[in-house]
């Protein structure tokens, strides 16, 4: 019996070898994966292993900064074109709506301005950009609010009244300046007017009617001066191709309604040089420099984010930030151009 047992034990297959012991790191990883996934299968690394992001070195950072700077310069040029061609029109439309609402309230209340000073406060000058009249020219489909002052900043919001001239509808000569192309280009079709076309202006004093007598450019003879007590309006804008002015275009129109008295005009010494026809605004350089410095800082920051964080995360932050700065610079840059463009 004992011999039979020994024979069976010898003929039985040997037991399988014990599994190889796992390294401590592998055991810990398996334990963590099992605890996190509830015993699910562990995630295996890709065949080539995980790709590590290269370290941020001064060379890569400098190259990224240069690339971001060139991109920002290109976007700035594109943004300026988009601002002049599209966004400035939206700016003009919004400003006109606000100006019309404000003037309508003043007309209804009888507090619309009729001179260079604030109504009921002769010691205070009317602020630049205040709405003073509504100008209509049916022949070219124009209806716009006229503002006080003729700086480039004022003319972004609509045509401006030259403060050294009388208000429209008053006895004397009233001068209105307006842009040809940018910011709505309200005076872009003045060259289409012909003698006999009508012009109407609504102010706090009157509803004045005018009739065009002539269009003139540099070198053309001046029209005869209006008689004493008569009214005239002169519309002024850039002449020539859009954004390539060759001079100044003036439209003279005599008043056919009864002029109202004028309380006076602002002295020439109070007028800023930036309010003259085709003037530029050098004060726009300061915000341009400040916005430009901020763009340089953003270029450096974006290059670091690109290399240290990731391109898609960087784009999410870069697009709104650069867009805002580019449009802000474009708005200020247009003030360096002649105010009638």
Where are these regions (language model features)?
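Terminal targeting segments of Actinobacterial cell-envelope proteins
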Residues: 1-61, 265-281, 289-298, 302
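Solvent-exposed, non-transmembrane regions of membrane-associated and secreted proteins
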Residues: 3-6, 49-52, 56-288, 333-341
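Alpha-helical transmembrane segments of integral membrane proteins
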Residues: 62-72, 291, 312-322
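Alpha-helical transmembrane segments forming the membrane-embedded cores
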Residues: 294, 298-341
């Amino acid at each position: 019996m004992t011999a039979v047992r020994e024979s069976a034990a010898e003929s039985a297959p040997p037991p399988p070898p014990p599994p190889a012991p796992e390294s401590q790191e592998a055991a810990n990883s398996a334990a963590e994966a099992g605890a996190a996934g509830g015993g699910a299968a562990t995630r295996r690394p890709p065949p080539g292993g995980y790709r590590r992001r290269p370290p941020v070195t001064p060379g890569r950072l400098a190259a990224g900064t240069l690339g971001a700077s060139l991109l920002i310069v290109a976007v700035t040029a594109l943004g300026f074109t988009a601002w002049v061609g599209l966004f400035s029109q939206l700016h003009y439309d919004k400003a006109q709506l606000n100006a019309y609402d404000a003037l309508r309230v003043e007309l209804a209340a009888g507090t619309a301005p009729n001179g260079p000073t604030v109504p009921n406060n002769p010691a205070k000058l009317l602020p630049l950009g205040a709405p003073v009249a509504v100008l209509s020219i049916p022949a070219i489909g124009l209806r716009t609010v006229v503002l006080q002052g003729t700086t480039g900043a004022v003319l972004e919001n609509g045509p401006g009244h030259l403060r050294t001239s009388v208000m429209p509808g008053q006895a004397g000569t009233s001068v209105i300046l307006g842009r040809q192309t940018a910011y709505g280009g309200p005076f872009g079709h003045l060259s289409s007017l012909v003698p006999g076309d009508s012009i109407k202006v609504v102010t706090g004093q009157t509803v004045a009617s005018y009739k065009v007598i002539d269009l003139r450019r540099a070198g053309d003879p001046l029209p005869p001066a209006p008689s004493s007590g008569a009214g005239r309006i002169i519309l002024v804008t850039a002449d020539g191709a859009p954004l390539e002015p060759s001079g100044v275009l003036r439209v003279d129109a005599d008043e056919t309604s009864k002029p109202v008295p004028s309380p006076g005009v602002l002295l020439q010494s109070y007028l800023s040089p930036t309010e003259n026809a085709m003037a530029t605004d050098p004060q726009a350089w300061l915000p341009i420099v400040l916005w430009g410095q901020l763009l340089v800082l953003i270029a450096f920051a974006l290059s670091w984010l690109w290399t240290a964080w990731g391109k898609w995360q960087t784009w999410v932050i870069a697009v709104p930030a650069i867009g805002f700065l580019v449009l802000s610079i474009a708005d200020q840059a247009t003030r360096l151009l002649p105010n009638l463009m």
